[in-house]
Every structure is written in structure tokens, then in C-alpha cells.
């Protein structure tokens, strides 16, 4: 979900903005703002994860991504919507990493955290491939990125719901003799 959205934006935002009549400058601004505000969002989410439920934070984060993408693609393209998207999507860009890592560590412990997070990151890369590929596929076959954006919105809504039933309590392990 996250990988799909990040790679869709990172790969296809220049073409999308060109299609919307705003040239390369808007994509440059968006990507620069995403990079800047990603730092703030990731640090902020790390802090919030020490104070609040990580699954709730992830649910809110993914729901906000859906809203931000909707605002961005359904409002008329402009300098202001580009700035809005760059700042807000940047705040949410990789802010999923601290609570996701913390949930994995909290539930499974830290002994195998590198292996478990490797599995999480592998699934992220499958999503990244899909975001890059499907963005191009839809554009080449339908002349628009709309379907890719709709998938990104749907994945955000799905992710916001699927995190809610997570039991954040550590798994009970039976010690072997």
C-alpha cells in the first residue's frame, strides 16, 4: 500500500503534472516539499508512536493519505494544490516506518526484528513495483493516471481499516527446556 503510493508519486508525478498543464516546475516543487516535510512527518510520527496506539496512528495516517490524494486529483491543478500536496503528502511519506517497525518489535520482540522488518520491506517493494508499473500501464493504455490514483485511494482506505484489528500486545512465548 505504502510502496504503491510512494512509487506512483515518485515515478509519475512529473508526467501527471505535465498532463494537468502545470509543467515540470510543479513536479519539482512537489517532490522537494515531500522530501523536506518527510523529515518532519517521520520524526513526528516516531514521537507520537511513543504516546499513542501505533495501529490507530497508522489507520489515521492511511486515511489522511486517501483524503489528500482525493483533494489533489479532484481539485483543479494549480500552484496552491501542488504546494498543498507536497507538504501534506510529504508529512505522511515515510511516516509509516516508525509505527510499523514499533508494532513488529512490540508484538514479536526485537530478537528477529531485522528478519521480520525485512519481510515487511519486501512486501513494500512488491507494492513499489506495482505503483511504478501500473501508473505507466494505465497511462499507456488509457491515456490517464486516474485508475492508478483510484487504486492508491482504495489501498489507503483498505490499509486504514486493516490496521484496526491488530492486537498490539506481545505474543506469549513458551520457553523450551
Predicted ranges, named:
Residues 153-177:
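Multi-pass alpha-helical transporter architecture, strongest
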Residues 42-53, 139-140:
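Helix-to-loop junctions at the C-terminal end of transmembrane segments
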Residues 137-155:
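A membrane-interface helix-boundary motif in multi-pass transporters
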Residues 1-45, 131:
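Extracytoplasmic gate region of multi-pass secondary transporters
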Residues 24-25, 110-120:
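Loop-to-transmembrane helix entry/capping segments in MFS-fold secondary transporters
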